[in-house]
Structures are given as C-alpha cells and as structure tokens.
Amino acid sequence: MKTHSARKLIPIILLGLFLLIACNFPLKVLWYSPKTAPTLDPAIFGHQGTPAITLQTPGANPLNPVTTLIPFDPNTSVSYIAQSGDTLSVVAAHFDVQPEQITSPQEISSQGILPTGQQLIVPKPAGAASYPVRLLPDSAVINSPCGRDLDIAAAIQGAGGYLNSYTQVVDDETLTGTQVVKRVAENTSTNPRLLLAFIEFRSHWLTQMPESPNLTYPLSLNTPHYEGLYLELSLVAKMLNTGYYAWRQGQIRDLTFSGGGSTGISPDLNAGTAGLLYLFSQLYSQPNFEIALYGENGFMATYRNLFGDPSICDAQIGPLLTSTVQTPVLELPFAAGEVWALTGGLHLDWNTGTPAGALDFAPVTGESRCVVSRAWVLASAAGVVSRVGDGVLQLTLTDENLQPTGWEVLYMHVAGQDRTALGTHVQADERIGHPSCEGGDATGTHVHIARLYKGEWIGAGAPFPLVLSGWTAVPGEKAYQSSLIKGDQVVDSRIDGMYNSQIVR
C-alpha cells in the first residue's frame, strides 16, 4: 500500500470514458487550453462610473490579521502570520523551504491546521515575488456564508441588465439567468457575488442592455465546446477552483500567462487571491493581466462597485478553517449487513479543480448496470437536506441541538424517486434515496460521496481524513484507485465491483 503526503495536480482528462462505474458531472468537457490573450474590449475597459482601486503594500493590506509580533532578523528571515486553512507543510511549500526550517514562539502543529494568527519565522525567500496584495478573502471566492446570503434573483433584477431577461436551455431544461448563476455557484461551490462580478466585467450583462449580445460566448472565453453562459461560467469556476485548491494544497508557486511568460507569486497570499490570480493568468497575457485585474476599470474595481468591501463579511464570520475544526463522525452510506462495492477510489469532489476527497459506492444487487436501484442510500450523519437537484442531495450536518456544524455531505447520483425532500431533518442511517445514474454521465448505478466545510471542498488525508464507519480512505497511485483500511482489513477500489472491492458495514 502506497501513500502520498502531497498530491500533484490531477491531469484534466476524461477518466469517465474508461470506467465501468464512474462519475462524469454535468460539465462534460474536462479540458481547457488557454488561447492567445484576448483583446481588451473598449466597452469593458472604457466603462465609466467604477471607482479606482488603489494598489496596497502588504503592510497596509486590510486582509492581513492584526497580531503582536516578536522580533526577527529581516536579513535572513520573514515573519508570516498563519491564515485560515494553513498547515505547516503547505506554508513550507509556499516559501519553498522544509517544514523543520520554520520556527515559532508557540508550538507548531506538524499535521493539523495552524491556529489563525500564529506567527511563523520563515527563511527569507530569494528575490521579490510578484502580486503580493491579497485581493479577496477566501469567503468571497468559495460559496461560504458570505455567498449563500445573497438573493441572486433580487441582485440580478435590481441591476436591471440583460441577464434579468436571459434564458438558456441546459440539458433540455430552460434556465433563467438567475438559475444559471445559482446552479454554477452551487455545483462548483463558488461565491455567486464573484460570478456576477465576472459576468459584469466581461459582458456588462448585469447592468446594461447590449444591442447585440454574444449568446455563443457571452464571457468571450471563445473556447470550443464551452458555448453559452452556463458552460462558460462553469469553466470560469473550474479555473478559479484549480488555483484556489492548488494553493490550499501547496501545489502552486508560479503563474503561467496566456500567450507565454511566467512569474512567481508571493508566498503569503491566501487561497482566494491565488485562485483569482490563476483564473486571470489563464485568460490574459501578463501586461493585460495587470490591467484587467488591478486597473481603474478592472475586475476588482467592478467587484467593489457592485458589492463593496468583501472583508467586512469575512470579518463577521471569522476564519473558515481553524485549528478547532473537528472531522465529523460519518457512517458508510448504506445499511449494516448489505454488500456494496468501492467502485471509485479517491477522486475529485466535484469536477476539475476540486480536491480528491470523494468515493463511489455501488450496491451489489445483480441489477442492470444503470438503473434506479432497489437499494437505499443512508444518511452518513444527522442533518438537514439543504439541496436537491438532478441526482444531487446535499446534507448540512447538525449537532445535538440541531444547529449547523459547518460540515456538509454531498451525495451524487441519488435518484429523484423516493428522494428525501428539501428541508427535511434526518438522523444518521435514515434512508435518503436510491443510487442511480442520474446527474451527469455516470456509467453505472452508484452513489458519489464528498464533503464540504462552510463551502470549501475537503480532500482526504490530513488535516481532515475521510473515515466512514471506521474505514479510512487511503490514496493510490492514480485517481479512482485507492483503498479503505480498518485495522488489518483492506478494501481496494475496482471499477467492476469484484473481488476485494466489496465491503460490508
């Protein structure tokens, strides 16, 4: 059994084409090749009425936490203040040093989340990094409580632009502009304010009525197979998530720009800013990147003009991932005594860009390959059904006082037949629906299970191992290939559900 302390970014490939039982979510095309840098649209960059944004030095950054610092030698070291979600290994990766080279006046956790505000003394990086300003807090990028409070329909209607009357057919269903934004925000767990700001920045559809709207490529991404607002906005979310979670896992230190060229980025950024930088680096050459993101009429100015200062809400809700967050106790999503198979080992929680923290289970019933199974999916913990949709059931976990804990469990490919209704409170092991092929392009009846915490997708392994009924998920060599281990028992994933992939709770 091989394990990995860190994962490389998983190549963006059509894995599902080769699997008997696999997850292909609604965004079917899983590749993206940046094109040459787009020409800056005068209609975008000539837009008036948007206040200028002033570039700040790191010391003046309002997103930097305030703390009392101890002295350090600035000739050899820098002082870094731990942020939401930081671990020692990830901070070391950002600064390109070994974990043992980092010191602190307080004890440093080697595995868990570092306390927010803890001072770390890190060897001084060689040379100055680019783009040191933290632009958006994490809560403004993922679908955190600072995103879920937004009435998307009211925001679009109040802005009075073309998006308010826009409709698009998605998977044989006619969606309004509000429904498109809501679906992308929920599917990818991306903050809807950011999505609306990006739509406005690239098309002005939020506040204006274009004479000849570009219905094929409204966001001007001009990428084959990504036509229409839904797919273009989904692609934006994928690129944003790629940067966000790569930073969260310590897998990115450089930006490579559309059209060529690269630069290192500051090691003390936050994941939200890294995600935004990555997104814009995929769309622009370096000179245009700076204008588009930082310019007087750039994206950040557009965002602030629409929604104000995101750090206000961020301060109200506090850090998202802290050292006090505990992994919830979860059960396997099926009844004791039943035989199911681990058909998909650890793979992407949702789609390209999200971490590898999901598992697939299929009931061993002898039924046809892609039917609504007679077997039942059970709730892995107590909670409230907070979202249902095409194959989707999302459970917001609650404590003994019925208060939300911040944790959520996503079940995908749950059939609409007999599915538990939105708003229903369920107990652990309560029936919530049947596994099926509904939702995306699943190639066999199964259920996909993944976790989120306050809107952030959670991978397996430290600091939040995925444990189901005492079985711990351990990664393998490739996506979908991993094991569940409980004491001396080992269950290996197999796409055909045979041999030692079968598991009894």
Where are these regions (language model features)?
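Primarily a LysM-type cell-wall glycan-binding module
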Residues: 33-34, 62-98, 118-120, 124, ...
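Zn2+-dependent peptidoglycan hydrolase active-site motif and core
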Residues: 372-422, 444-446, 450
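Short glycine/threonine/proline-enriched tight-turn/helix- or strand-capping micro-motif at secondary-structure
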Residues: 322-325, 329, 340-380
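Acidic, glycine-rich catalytic/binding loops that coordinate metals and/or anionic ligands
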Residues: 323, 328-330, 371, 378, ...
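Short alpha-helical segments in extracytoplasmic peptidoglycan/chitin-binding modules
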Residues: 82, 87-105, 117, 185, ...
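Ser/Thr-rich, Proline-interspersed low-complexity disordered segments
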Residues: 23-83, 107, 123-142, 318, ...
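Catalytic glycan-binding domains that act on GlcNAc-containing polysaccharides
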Residues: 132-291
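Non-catalytic cell-wall polysaccharide-engagement segments
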Residues: 26-29, 220-341, 481-505
